[in-house]
Amino acid sequence: MQQSKIKTNVLIIGKSGVGKSSLLNYIFGKELEKTGAGKPISEGINTHDYEYDDEFVISISDTEGLEPGKAEQWKKLILNEVKSHDEKEICEWFNTIIYCFSANSGKVEDFEINIIKELLQEKNQVTVVITNCDNENDSSDAGKSKRKTIKAMIDRITEKTGIAAADVVPVCSVKKILLNGKEVAPTGKEKIITLIIENLWKTFREKIPFKLYQYENNEYYGYATRISKVIKETSFLFHKIKKVFDVGNRVSNFLQDYDESVRNDVDSLIQESSEYYHRLSKKYLNISWKYYYDDPHMPQISLEYINKVNADVDNIIEALHKSNKKIYNLFIKEDVSKEVIKNLLFAIMENVKRSKEIRKTLDGIANKQIVEIHDRHINALRKVKENIEATNIEKCYTKQLELKKGDSL
């Protein structure tokens, strides 16, 4: 059975009229074809495939342009689309998001800055393209003014979003003849293709560790909330020993589920990323990806913390046994004096009061153990991150680009 082609995913976004269609035609030309018989993959988004070489495909998702008065709706569409891809397998993630602005309008609006910042916060690789940059050889006042506008746009984008200047690409998508008779050739295509390839590899080094941390934190807060809810909603007024025992077991089960869930999903993502990038490195470097990345695994650590919970629960139960025995001994006294009755009532009141103490103690026990498991997870993920960051991805994508050099882009 023939193995499917390696794919990188690109999302192209921008307001209506910025020249996205011209940009797509310029970069990908006749090799660009709509997938799915031209049907959109989701409302407002169409996808196309570009055959980079015999085994590598660039899949482009093209959003509809922003229409006036629909900024929030458009922003939601974009962020939801990226999020939905992040929840799929790594091969479906967007490795590059191209945000288009037009030099003709010269506008970089605040809501667009905010979209880019939100995308960057999730460790997406964002490349900014400024279209209609056809003034390189234009010595007229209009040409000089446009160059000034483009510089101001680049400065605003880099300052407000933190994007590196190297990730902002001025592009001229169509050939143009200036009034002075000089010809402006299309430019920027090779730079964009280069960034798409680089971003494919940078996703591994930057986004995968981020997603691992993000997933662990979500699981931690989710399980901590569930444990706290169980303890809070349990009444320890009657049948204290049985309830403490039952809650202790539930806490132990939650801790084990939390540890196993994180461990299994982290290992799965590590394995998935290793296999995906192994295919790339095998093709473009003719070596195993494991040469660069020895994928680690999360250790199983929940058992020792479950034992600690059980020991702490046993201590609570032992204290309850002593309290119950004290009350029982007062009950069976033959000489029921006022002092005995007083002591009995006091012991019963103390037993009732202890219900709140039990809840507080159990909450402290559970919180201490889940925090320790969380810390151990984070330490393990830190080692994974260090291992990933140590990989020589620059050599990987440089080699991939070198193999393509000389071919027609």
Features from the language model and the residues they span:
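Conserved G1/Walker A P-loop phosphate-binding module
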Residues: 1-68
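Extended hydrophobic secondary-structure segments that form protein cores and membrane-embedded regions
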Residues: 11-12, 60-62, 95-101, 129, ...
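Conserved protein kinase catalytic core
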Residues: 31, 67-68, 105-108, 137-138, ...
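Short glycine-rich substrate-engagement loop in P-loop NTPases that contacts/grips substrate
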Residues: 38-41, 72-78
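Flexible beta-alpha connector loops of hexameric P-loop NTPases
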Residues: 64-73, 140-145
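Conserved C-terminal guanine-recognition region of P-loop GTPase G domains, centered on the G4
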Residues: 77-164
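Canonical P-loop GTPase G-domain recognition
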Residues: 134-203
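Extended helical scaffolds that flank P-loop GTPase cores
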Residues: 188-190, 194-409
